[in-house]
Structure formats: structure tokens, C-alpha cells
């Protein structure tokens, strides 16, 4: 084995020189230069500095403006809540431990950080699944006269939390475990060892199949069918131009969210699967650190996409930030009105664009 396994940790360095120490008790500066830990801390501070305001603003603006409180927006707000979980439960912890050079918060802190990071990522993934299914149901109409209502949105929210908990909770109760990874300043699922009594192998397979591959298959199926339906509707001119345009805008926004999720999380998932299938092989601390910390940036892209691609939300956000008056409203009056009308063709089936 090209690493050192201890009680509740695995360090990717053979302890031939005797310098390897527990990541819960000693700085890990023998793994990489101390400056790298400072850089990680600064990176996490940047994510907090951006992630908290944009996600909180998304929640606040939607709650303040009644016209934004549509069923589909409930799911988008769910993404903001998940991101805030990651910011408060994960990022603050990781920034603090990076500043110390080791996981100074001990096993409890590791469990909390790993849990919140996993929970937030899974809520985001399953929210994208619900959005994909909603787009498929509304645009492709496999069920005639289907309207995505408040009851559907609430069921979708409950579904995302149940599925996320089904992935994040088991390591807390003995099916696998959370351990420090990479530079030993953040925690994740134990892909690294076959520690006796934790059944890591079965949990990792369960997680990859049920909480990564199956959701992605559902998403790709829905958007494959969606693409075909949009082309057919455009060719047949079955719906009004404003309705088609509004549905395309919403679908485009959700597709970009899915692509951004894949860009952020696929490197981490790929490296984790490689480590799991090549346990004992040689790899450095940075091998897992880069994809793990890159995945954490997912907390800021969803609200940024939402703000950039949803003109109605942008107008409401500017109004909120400017104390109830939008200084650009007069300049964009006619354009904004036409866009709002297009986005409001059917609040239950076309929101939130």
C-alpha cells in the first residue's frame, strides 16, 4: 500500500520515515508546502464571500416579490438552500482547518463537514433531476394537460431531501465513513480503504449507481426527449411564438445548470472512482485536492446562472437592491414588458424565465 492508514484517516504517503501523523492532531505540512494550505484557505474565503450573498439574495428576492413565487421556482430556491448548507456547514469549516494545516476540529468536525458537502451536492443533483422531469412533462406532454403546480413542487422538494439524506446519512451511522482527504483539510466519503466493519465497497458502489449514474441517465433522457419535442413543435408551429420562446429560455437555463454541475462534479467523481478501483496505488495529496475543491465552486454557479439568464428575476433583484425602485425600468420599459409577458404565458408550466 502506497499510503498510511490509521484510525479514521488515510494519508497518501508511506510512513517509512516516521513523519506521518494523524490529520486530527498535527499539521500536515510534510505533504505539501504550507503556502498551499494558505491558498486553500483564501480560496474557501472567496467562495464564502461570493456564495453567501448570491444565494441569500436569490432567496430574499424571491420571497419579497410575489410574482417570482411560482412552483418551478421552489425547486430553484431549493438549490440556493442547498448551496447555503454547503457555505455554512462546509466552507467555513474547511477554511478554518486550512488555516491550521490539519483537521483541527476532530472527528465530529470531519463528520459535519463531510455530511454538509455531500448533502448539498446531492440536493443540487436531485433538484436538477426534478427540473429535468418537469421540463419533459411540460414540453413533451407525456401526460396530456399536465400542469406543474404547487403540490408537485412540494413533492419534488421532499424527494430531493430524502434522496440526498439517503446518501449523506449512512456514513454517519456506520455504512462507510467520512475521513479527511487530499491535503487532509476537508472530508469526504472513504474511497481509499477497505476498513473492517464499514462496508466501504458496497456503499461506494451504491452511491455511484443510485446517486450519480441513475440521476444522470434520467437527466439525459429527459433532455434528449425535450430536444426532439422542441424541434418538432417549432417545425409544426403547434404553439404560439411567445410560448415557444419562453419554454426555450427556461429549458436553456436548466440545461446550462446541468452542464455546469457536470463540469464541477465529474472530475471529483472520476478521481474518486479511480481511487476506489485502484486502492493501494500511488497518488499524491493534490490528486484529490484539486477536484474536491473545484467541486465546491458549484455553490456559486447556480444563482449566477439564474441571475444572468432570468430577466424577470434580474429586474426584481435590481428593484430590491435599489430600495424599491429600478433605475433602469424606464429605459427598458417596452422590452421588459414584452419579455415578462412571454415568461408569464403559463406560470405553472413555463416559469421562471
Curated annotation (Swiss-Prot):
The transmembrane residues are 37-61, 74-96, 111-133, 153-173, 203-224, 253-274, 287-308
Which residues are listed under lipidation as S-palmitoyl cysteine? 322-323
Molecular function terms from GO = 11-cis retinal binding; G protein-coupled photoreceptor activity
Question: Which parts of the chain does the record assign to the membrane side Cytoplasmic?
Answer: 62-73, 134-152, 225-252, 309-353
UniProt keyword Phosphoprotein present: yes
Residue ranges, Extracellular side: 1-36, 97-110, 174-202, 275-286
Name under which the protein is recorded: Rhodopsin
* Gene name per UniProt: rho
